[in-house]
Amino acid sequence: MKTKNRPPRRRTPMQDAEATPGEQTPDRSQSGSGASEVTKGLRSRTARASGTRAEVSRRRQGSSSRRENSVQRRLESNERERQRMHKLNNAFQALREVIPHVRADKKLSKIETLTLAKNYIKSLTATILTMSSSRLPGLEAPGPAPGPKLYQHYHHQQQQQQQQQQVAGAVLGVTEDQPQGHLQRYSTQIHSFREGS
């Protein structure tokens, strides 16, 4: 192993920062403007050194407080996320209790709950619109229906779905002899969820 030979460092004796050029000891003072320049240099060096020490201590204090703040923020964030998930799970449980389904031994998954809820809403909407369309004389007339916009929108969606089902049935070679009612389709889907799981 090689050792490095370095010359010993020369240290300039540090003067007291409060000392003025007049208070210097005679052996260290120099005559003329050179003495004041040396004193200024020593003072600035002393001030820089004490300022650096203060900065380092501030950095240490700042980094520890930053670390504590970071930990605190992370804990608060985790708690907010826990509360959010708790609320979400409670909402899913409330939805499971409202939707009619057959399986009582095992709770529905989130995707099953959402799918059944969507289809249940669609079937109820279709039933309500079917019941209300028989009472509205304007909806049975040929041509564009002057009825409610909800009915028109739903009727348009149903026509598109029927066309897609007919195209899919023609491609697969399946024909539907008797169209099923909306509630009957929904109950069939409930039973398929029960058998599938």
From Swiss-Prot:
Name the Pfam families for this protein: HLH (PF00010)
**bHLH domain location:** 72-124
Expression across tissues is:
Expressed in liver, spleen and olfactory epithelium. Weaker expression is seen in skeletal muscle, cardiac muscle, eye and brain tissue.
Gene Ontology molecular function terms on file:
DNA binding; DNA-binding transcription activator activity, RNA polymerase II-specific; DNA-binding transcription factor activity, RNA polymerase II-specific; E-box binding; identical protein binding; protein dimerization activity; RNA polymerase II transcription regulatory region sequence-specific DNA binding; sequence-specific double-stranded DNA binding
Question: Which portions of the chain have biased composition (kind: Basic and acidic residues)?
Answer: 65-82
In which domain of life is the source organism classified? Eukaryota
Q: How does it assemble?
A: Forms homodimers or heterodimers with TCF3 gene products E12 and E47. These dimers bind to the E-box site, however, heterodimer with MYOD1 does not bind target DNA.
Name listed for the protein in its UniProt record: Class A basic helix-loop-helix protein 15
From which organism does this entry originate?
Rattus norvegicus
Q: What is the lineage of its organism?
A: Eukaryota, Metazoa, Chordata, Craniata, Vertebrata
> Quick one: which gene encodes this?
Bhlha15
